[in-house]
């Protein structure tokens, strides 16, 4: 069920910022999916990018004065992302060899183009997700309508799940250690 809301100028500005963040996340995930060497990482980036597209649609609805219902289940795809992170160390070693070989191939080709490693792509997206999640955390307290706050809180939780999926992937590949 969709309800209508009248937004303040400040709320509109905050949503415009969120819209820009979501658009940038969509672009980054799309680009990084193409740049990633590991198929598992490509899948994480693809799934996260699809969720970012949903977030953008939700933000656009809010900007048009419509508050969408947030009772649809979206945790299934996030749970499958998290489980993708737990692959064997044999695959992890193979992915590192492929990544190292890609870097060597890039260096020996004589081109000056930069080829980001999967770790660099993950690190950048993890920082991006941390930032975007924190902006939602701040924005939530600036909205007077409880339903809008609930929608923004829902998006923030999904942003945290994106970061969790990237973290789990990085940890499973030996790219990140929380200790």
Predicted features by range, described:
Residues 11-35, 90-154:
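Acidic/histidine-rich alpha-helical segments that form the ligand environment
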Residues 15-19, 33-35, 158-179:
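A detector of long soluble domains/segments in diverse envelope-associated and cytosolic proteins
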Residues 39-97, 160-174:
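Conserved alpha-helical segments that form or flank metal/cofactor-binding pockets of metalloenzymes
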Residues 1-12, 61-80, 101-119, 171-179:
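Membrane-interacting alpha-helical segments
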Residues 6-7, 17-52, 56-57:
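Acidic, metal/ion-handling microdomains and their immediate structural contexts
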Residues 20, 47-54, 124-127, 154-161:
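DHp/HisKA dimerization-phosphoacceptor four-helix bundle of two-component histidine kinases
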């Amino acid at each position: 069920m969709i309800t209508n809301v009248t937004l303040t100028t400040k709320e509109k500005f905050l949503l415009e910022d969120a819209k820009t963040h979501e658009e940038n996340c969509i672009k980054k995930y799309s680009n990084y999916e193409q740049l990633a060497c590991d198929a598992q990482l490509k899948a994480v980036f693809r799934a996260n990018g699809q969720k970012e597209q949903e977030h953008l649609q939700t933000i656009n609805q809010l900007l048009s004065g419509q508050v969408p219902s947030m009772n649809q289940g979206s945790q299934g795809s996030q749970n499958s992302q998290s489980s993708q992170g737990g692959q064997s160390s044999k695959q992890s070693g193979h992915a590192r060899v492929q990544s190292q070989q890609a870097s060597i191939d890039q260096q020996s080709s004589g081109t000056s183009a930069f080829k980001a490693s999967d770790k660099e792509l993950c690190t950048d997206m993890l920082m991006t997700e941390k930032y975007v999640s924190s902006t939602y955390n701040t924005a939530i307290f600036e909205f007077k309508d409880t339903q809008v706050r609930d929608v923004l809180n829902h998006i923030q939780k999904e942003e945290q799940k994106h970061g969790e999926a990237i973290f789990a992937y990085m940890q499973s590949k030996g790219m990140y250690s929380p200790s």
